[in-house]
């Protein structure tokens, strides 16, 4: 994660001089992952795990919530208009093994950005920062 570089995305539609360095946030289980980026360079500054009691969505004016549920991942997020995404593995995703990871990727999508949102849980985005898939990391994979 230390070398992760991103283009800055203005999720809130604000102008450059009022956008804060807080760019993305994922809620997972009873906590949040905050991802801080530099507006000027797009480089990752730090990642924090916050308690569920913090009022983060008010602070950053947007929210992304990820839920793993059986063979699906559900991602709710605000991006201009509210968008709801639910992916069923059996119907829409291709499964791969890559570098000790199980990767579920939407057909025809390529991974531009990988973010570990929780230990061993990964989200993948395409070059338009739309979710391309998700995966899990297996450090002790049996061959």
Q: PLM features: what roles do these ranges have?
A:
Residues 1-21, 47, 52-103, 141-143:
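Intrinsic disorder/low-complexity detector
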Residues 23, 30-32, 46-54, 106-111, ...:
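Secondary-structure transition/turn motif
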Residues 34-41, 124-126:
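Hydrophobic alpha-helical segments, especially N-terminal targeting/anchoring helices
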Residues 111-143:
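Mixed-charge, glycine-accented linear interaction segment located at domain edges/termini
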Residues 11, 26-28, 68, 112, ...:
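Phenylalanine-focused residue identity feature
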Residues 20-34, 100-116, 120-121:
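Exposed beta-strand-loop-beta-strand "reactive/processing" segments of non-cytosolic proteins
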Residues 31-33, 43, 130:
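Short acidic/polar mixed-charge low-complexity motifs
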